[in-house]
Amino acid sequence: MKIISVLGSTGSIGTQTLEVVRNNKDLKVSALAASSNITLLEEQIREFHPKLVCVYDREKALELKKRVSDLEVTVEAGMDGLIACATEESADIVVSAVVGMIGIKPVMEAILRGKDIAFANKETLVTAGHLIMPLVKKHNVNLLPVDSEHSAIFQCLQGNESSTVSRIILTASGGPFRGKSLAELKNVKVEDALKHPNWSMGRKITIDSATMVNKGLEVMEAHWLFHEPLNKIEVVIQPQSIIHSAVEFEDGGIIAQLGTPDMKLPIQYALYYPEKRRYLPGKRLDFFDIAKITFEKPDISNLPGLRLAYEAMNTGHSVPTVFNAANELAVAKFLNREISFLSITALIEKAMENVTVVKRPTLDEILNVEQETYDFIERECVKSNYHI
């Protein structure tokens, strides 16, 4: 029996994680955490019977407490509650599927207590990789990627020495606006950006895919996870999302991981690692149904999110935090129809140019830079024309 805690249980990765649990009797849930969706969280509590739950929104937590008063479950709130779920004593592995830098503290606390981490919160590594990776090594825990691309790379590396890697090939679908001109991108609406061609994901990550910021975040994540320099991480557009990523070795051989676009595959792989693979219901890849597999170079001119990510990581220190925080707020403003689609990356670039760089930031300094970046974006939106 493997016992898991799920942070972000009502989101896209969280609900798919619970689908995997539902299909496997040797997985048990000890803790669930959500932001504010207490209707779905209550359903999850009644089905999976966790000991502990957290609702980040304190008012919603009080309401949930009343709703589940007939059950033996402890309801916590806020950051303290999130950390309590991440460190729940009986949990063997913590699924970190919250959105944004809110996941940093809970993940660090879980590692300190020797928990393995199934990792879907890339922002945590992007901003605090220099703090988290030494902890992973010190406490000898597994940091298991749940992103389809990083899981693919992780699988390709099994049985191979990392010293023999010559290149990591990180694939991308190109998002809904692959091949679009700058003129076409000027008139993009929220509904257009939320139509990903291949994957079913949450709203924020779907927008990140459209701007190519998501792939930039994944480059940073790959740097930390696989200890490779940026010049050995190459992004390749693979529009059909069949090749999830690949690794080239120094003898010229390339190992790739292929499959249908189903997030439950990397989730289940992480939950059971290092055990043997388990049966997973779902559609199988039929090579005879594939009309073609094509490859393209990413468009860093019209969709500069990837270029900005490389620049942020090359500068290092607190700049990846600025990149991430600026993107988080800009995406939220776009989804609220306050700014245009192209303004997202314009604001990121402006923030990277103006927010003070902090060298080797501590956790507190990372959070301060995050707030400073939010404040800068708010001021910039007031004084400049980023609106639709």
Swiss-Prot record:
Protein keywords: Isoprene biosynthesis, Manganese, Metal-binding, NADP, Oxidoreductase
GO annotation (BP), single: isopentenyl diphosphate biosynthetic process, methylerythritol 4-phosphate pathway involved in terpenoid biosynthetic process
GO terms, molecular function: 1-deoxy-D-xylulose-5-phosphate reductoisomerase activity; manganese ion binding; NADPH binding
EC id: 1.1.1.267
Keyword Zinc: no
Pfam families: DXP_redisom_C, DXP_reductoisom, DXPR_C
Binding, Mn(2+): 147, 149, 218
Pathway: Isoprenoid biosynthesis; isopentenyl diphosphate biosynthesis via DXP pathway; isopentenyl diphosphate from 1-deoxy-D-xylulose 5-phosphate: step 1/6
Cofactor(s), names only, from the UniProt record: Mg(2+); Mn(2+)
Binding site for NADPH: 10-13, 37, 121, 123, 202
Reactions catalysed, as given in the entry: 2-C-methyl-D-erythritol 4-phosphate + NADP(+) = 1-deoxy-D-xylulose 5-phosphate + NADPH + H(+)
Residues reported in the UniProt entry to bind 1-deoxy-D-xylulose 5-phosphate: 122, 148-149, 173, 196, 209, 214-215, 218
PANTHER family listed in its UniProt record: 1-DEOXY-D-XYLULOSE 5-PHOSPHATE REDUCTOISOMERASE (PTHR30525), 1-DEOXY-D-XYLULOSE 5-PHOSPHATE REDUCTOISOMERASE, CHLOROPLASTIC (PTHR30525:SF0)
Functional description taken from the UniProt entry: Catalyzes the NADPH-dependent rearrangement and reduction of 1-deoxy-D-xylulose-5-phosphate (DXP) to 2-C-methyl-D-erythritol 4-phosphate (MEP).
Family: Belongs to the DXR family.
HAMAP family, sorted: DXP_reductoisom (MF_00183)
Identification of the protein by name: 1-deoxy-D-xylulose 5-phosphate reductoisomerase
Provenance organism: Lachnoclostridium phytofermentans (strain ATCC 700394 / DSM 18823 / ISDg)
Taxonomic lineage from the root: Bacteria, Bacillati, Bacillota, Clostridia, Lachnospirales
